[in-house]
Amino acid sequence: MNPNDNNLFGDIEQDNNPSFYGNQSFLRDPYGKSKQTCPPSVTSNGDPSITNDDNNSAHNNDLVSNSIVLSKKIEQMVNDPNLQINVISSERMINSSVVAYSIELSSFDDNRMIVKRRYSEFKSLRDNLQILFPTLVIPPIPEKHTLFTYLINSIDNSKELNIIETRKRCFANFLKDIIFDSNVALKSCVLVHKFLDPNYELCWNNAVNEPPVSLIPNNLLLANPVNPTDQNGLYSLLPIVNGFELNSNIDNISSLHKLNEDLHKLNEQVHVFELRKEQNERRHPSEPTTSLFTEIPISLIDFEKNFHQNIKVLTELNKLNSRSVKNFKSIINTLIELGGNLNNFSLQIHELNTDSNALSSLIEKFGSTIDSNFLGYEAFLMNDIIPEWQEPISQLVQYYLTSLQLIKFYKFKIIQYKLVYKLKFNKYQELANISTNFESQSKLKDLRNLDIDSPSINEAIKKIELNQKRLKNRKISSKKSWYGLFGGNSKPTFNLREDLPASTIPSEGTGIRRERTPLVSDENMSYPVNPSANLENTNIDINSHYKHKINQIEKELTKLDQLIDLTNTDISTLTQELNLNFNDFLVRVEKKWLVIMLEFIKNGKQLFKDNLQNWNECKVFINDL
């Protein structure tokens, strides 16, 4: 095989494209009504062997080549430091209330590209980026309209136009942040390139149903927290914690500080468990193969507190901004009314005294100065306060809310980490109960085989039967009660299918990810008080029965040990990634905040400078009269 064949499809990313497989004219004529059947034509060189099929094949090859070239062009433009990204226009789709936004990508070397996207496609891109990169703070987009907002917009069209203009600015900032002011992994993501690809303009759903998105399980808790596309089959065996929703801002879990205390208790339980296990198995203490994750770093705990405090402060600042915008609008309306009245008054004075126009000119100049100030205030409000101050502050709030979503994901992974240990504790206790029951059953069988009417033997038999009953009741009463604390409504027992061959059990690299393996019902793992009677009736050998159950649980414990090693490694890696990314995020936010403040001060200074110049001109005019 040619070694170059390994990269045969490496550059092809335009699959599932209508334009990739054929001419886009079929979109205008999808049912082929304008087609006319005609016999194969002979080419101009007179060779009848070259038909239209050959020409179509050559044409399709050209389309493939063009798509690959376009994909490469997008990749180059994204990495171009001189790239300009703007949302230049918006338009309503035909017979629909949906608005499409035109995104223009341009650079100094005359490269220019336009692609149209709807709000739902922007949201889809961001949601999928959050799933692909669960440790990165993804730039925010405007929130979706509520039903009440839609009703208001249907009454007042000007409000809807303002919202569309706001979205245009926010979408442009969203794309600029991804390309220029975020982790390099975001702008290198294939999904971002497809979003900017005109070939995917009409088939965005295909893009989100292709790799890498299609490789991620439905529940992000069943994936590698740092690399969700990892196809390690062990992740499909992890316990699910109900209530997890990455995109929601609702977080009902305790703070990281409280979870840290729970982790300390868990580590104490693990230590006691290992000691008892060593005593029961009569072996020397051994070093764990994987270092245990023992504590949440204080830096992450401080990050959570910091984010909450900043959200509180910025939310209050948003309220002040809203009041300031209303006050500016009130000032503008007052200046408009005052300027108009002064101009009318100057005309009335001029009509009353046509011989001298000094007073009329003075009043007119004063009104003109008021009008100039009104225009300055209006420009400051529409061009500076709203787009350069109010909207960026709201964007910072959304940034911090997104960072809290990452912390929420981290909390759920901590809980999942604890649940894996709880599963091991319960499963080991189940093994101990079955082993004890097996030993008791063997003793009971031996005692009954003695066939001696002895009070001491009868007392021993009763004692063994009582112990068996107590073991069963304890097993039933304590059965997986921890799972109910997290909203579980199904059996959480970690069971491997007894009829599943060992070769098919998910392990590293198997890629069994999409569906969880059906679990054996807990009833299959329960045992009667007097199992010998049932076993004799069904002619099942009691020894093989118990040995089979014990062997099954030992296999499950082996898998649980693998899961513990996996989760230990994942939690440690996730902690390091979040620490690193949050530090980088705060540096970026600090830069954004400085830029916002400096721009606000500069624009405000320019407003007052222009107002002062207007009044100085008015003063000079008055002195010259």
Curated annotation (Swiss-Prot):
Superkingdom of this protein's organism: Eukaryota
Entry's Gene Ontology cellular component terms: cytosol; endosome membrane; phagophore assembly site membrane
PX domain segment(s): 79-202
Keywords: Autophagy, Endosome, Lipid-binding, Membrane, Protein transport, Transport
Cystine connections: none
GO biological process, one term: protein transport
Gene3D superfamilies: Phox-like domain
Pfam families named among the record's database cross-references: PX (PF00787)
Membrane topology (UniProt): Peripheral membrane protein
Family stated for the protein in its record: Belongs to the sorting nexin family.
Function per UniProt: Required for cytoplasm to vacuole transport (Cvt), pexophagy and mitophagy. Also involved in endoplasmic reticulum-specific autophagic process and is essential for the survival of cells subjected to severe ER stress. Functions in protein retrieval from the endocytic pathway.
Name of the protein described by the UniProt record: Autophagy-related protein 20
Organism whose genome encodes this protein: Debaryomyces hansenii (strain ATCC 36239 / CBS 767 / BCRC 21394 / JCM 1990 / NBRC 0083 / IGC 2968)
